[in-house]
């Protein structure tokens, strides 16, 4: 093998196995002008508390927002859009919780004492942001 072949082979292999970069921040620092992220955690997939199959997850994030109320947000990056559709169809509604599927993300928002209009603005902005994200 020539030096050039070794260099190309080494370069190609160096790109393998690296952690995928974040293509978009599903839970940004500021949302809808009134919600501020106070905590953010990149969670291990094994700690996903919801009925999302771990084999269908690429990433799991959690964040706490304060504004006109409190929102606990969980964002699941899925391996396929089909998984998102299935989750959206089978998810069980619960009090003070909203969920939605956008692109390859499934988002669960649980709120406390939140202003409904501000909560709707939060949901609309995050959903629009994820639906305009480049496909992976």
Task: Map each language-model feature to its residues.
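N-terminal export signals
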Residues: 5-19
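N-terminal "mature-domain start" segment
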Residues: 16-68, 114-136
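A short, solvent-exposed beta-edge/loop patch
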Residues: 62-136
């Amino acid at each position: 093998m020539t030096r050039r072949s070794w260099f190309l082979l080494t370069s190609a292999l160096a790109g393998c196995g690296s952690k995928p970069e974040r293509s978009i921040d599903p839970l940004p620092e500021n949302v809808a002008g009134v919600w501020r992220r106070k905590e953010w955690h990149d969670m291990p997939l094994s700690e996903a508390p919801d009925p999302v199959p771990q084999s269908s997850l690429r990433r799991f994030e959690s964040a706490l927002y304060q504004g006109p109320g409190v929102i606990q947000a969980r964002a699941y990056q899925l391996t396929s859009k089909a998984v998102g559709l299935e989750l959206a169809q089978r998810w069980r509604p619960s009090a003070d919780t909203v969920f939605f599927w956008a692109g390859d993300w499934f988002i669960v928002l649980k709120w406390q004492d939140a202003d409904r209009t501000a909560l709707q603005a939060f949901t609309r902005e995050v959903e629009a942001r994820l639906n305009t994200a480049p496909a992976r």
